[in-house]
């Protein structure tokens, strides 16, 4: 269990979910794909240019788990690496490095975004999010549409046109009331949305 996973578990629990990790239980109502290291570029037909923390066993496990969830019609929500993974799984590609979206001195960055689709329904059209990534979505996978953008045009959220699949590039699990960064939205609201879709 990677060290960041308790953040996701506590945030999902606060949002009303009963959390299970892969391998603990065969049945589940929805799949959350969490953040982490970069996906190997061979998964989207590219050469390695700028990658950090690649774990090809994790890539394989999560891609297969996503495929199974897709076949079963389970709701899926991706966060940071997770939205990148579901994009790649659906045939999309990634920018291997973007400037201005990484942590600074170990602290999440902040930036303004504009939204539509499911994100706008939750938070409104314009709001601030945290930022802690150096890769980003490039060509979108089959059926995905962008619904949130940073001011530089980087995609911050997607939704599927017909399937229960959503993802965000930012970290709602770090935005819980009480320890979220000043001026950012309450991440529990979007996690509650996901949990509500898993009923």
Spans of model-derived segments:
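N-terminal beta1-alpha1 cap of cysteine-dependent amidohydrolase-like domains
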Residues: 1-79, 88-95, 99-123, 128, ...
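Active-site-proximal beta-strand elements of phosphoester/diester hydrolases
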Residues: 166-170
